[in-house]
Amino acid sequence: MTCETAPHYLILNENDLQESGDFKMNPPLRSKEDQEALIKGIQDGTIDMIATDHAPHSEEEKAKGQKKSAMGIVGLEKAFPLLYTGLVKTDIISLEKLIELLNDNPRRRFGLKQEDSWCLWDLNDHYVIDEKDFLSKGKASPFKGMEVYGRCLKTVCEGRTVYEYKGE
């Protein structure tokens, strides 16, 4: 049996909600107590995976406020920096635990190979999340303007470079 949660439920709670459609997701953000229970779940192993729940939508689909915007946010590109900043740098979990939750456990669960596939990160690179830097077609993110650590410098998939950071 496995259990997963998404980065936004570990980093945000209902106190962070704004009227913007960027904050509309399903399930919605819950209480601080619920957020703390999820964090306890990743610490004690009840939750063994973190999945991004990446749901890109057009600007038009997300510009209708909380009530009428499409459900979902982008999550793939900034999951690691958000979780590294919010959970590892604050000593809630170790870097090894984060890698286990994001990579190792999902890979084992779904029988995925990792041959010649890796990412190179600069864990000291500190920056502000800006939607103009997103490669995803969707830009809806409740994390815009947040300061994070950790920039992906290179991604290699099955021996082929699929991403390389070119600088600002």
Predicted regions mapped to residue ranges:
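Histidine/acidic residue-rich metal-binding segments in metalloenzymes
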Residues: 1-50
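Short, glycine/acidic-enriched loop or turn micro-motifs at the edges of active sites
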Residues: 7, 56, 125
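Glycine/Thr-rich phosphate-binding loops of Rossmann-like dinucleotide-binding domains
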Residues: 11, 58-60, 128-129, 165
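Short acidic, glycine/serine/threonine-rich loops at helix termini
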Residues: 12-17, 61-64, 131-133
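His/Asp/Glu-enriched, well-ordered alpha-helical/loop segment
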Residues: 22-23, 43-44, 49-50, 55-121
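A short acidic, glycine-rich active-site loop
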Residues: 24-34, 70-74, 142-148
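C-terminal cap of metal-dependent C-N hydrolases
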Residues: 65-68, 116-167
